[in-house]
């Protein structure tokens, strides 16, 4: 199912998902350093593999994904299938509602 068919996202629910599943490796705080994964501030509209100061895999740089709701929705289903060779070890969020909620939170928190 594509993002066009996704349920409406709830940013509050997405924040809980971020804190339990993403926060260990990522931050959304402007000006914060990178963790194991890159800082996600300014994520929307950015190309994959381009955050200054973070060492990305060649796969992530070469894929040149433009991060928007649609691409994140597909990526978060199965990151290793979407970008083979990515360093992200997260297996993905299988439930469409979880992905929609997380994207709604990221849209708010990374702007």
Swiss-Prot record:
* Disulfide bond positions: none
Q: Domain of life of the organism in this record?
A: Eukaryota
**Which Pfam families does its entry note?**
Cytochrom_C
Residue positions annotated to bind heme c are 22, 25-26, 88
Entry-annotated residues carrying N-acetylalanine: 1
What keywords appear on the UniProt entry?
Acetylation, Electron transport, Heme, Iron, Metal-binding, Methylation, Mitochondrion, Respiratory chain, Transport
Q: Record's PROSITE patterns? A: CYTC
User: What subcellular compartments does it reside in?
Assistant: Mitochondrion intermembrane space
Which residues in this protein are found as N6,N6,N6-trimethyllysine? 80, 94
**Post-translation: what modifications?**
Binds 1 heme c group covalently per subunit.
Q: Which family does it belong to?
A: Belongs to the cytochrome c family.
Function of the protein: Electron carrier protein. The oxidized form of the cytochrome c heme group can accept an electron from the heme group of the cytochrome c1 subunit of cytochrome reductase. Cytochrome c then transfers this electron to the cytochrome oxidase complex, the final protein carrier in the mitochondrial electron-transport chain.
Record-given protein name: Cytochrome c
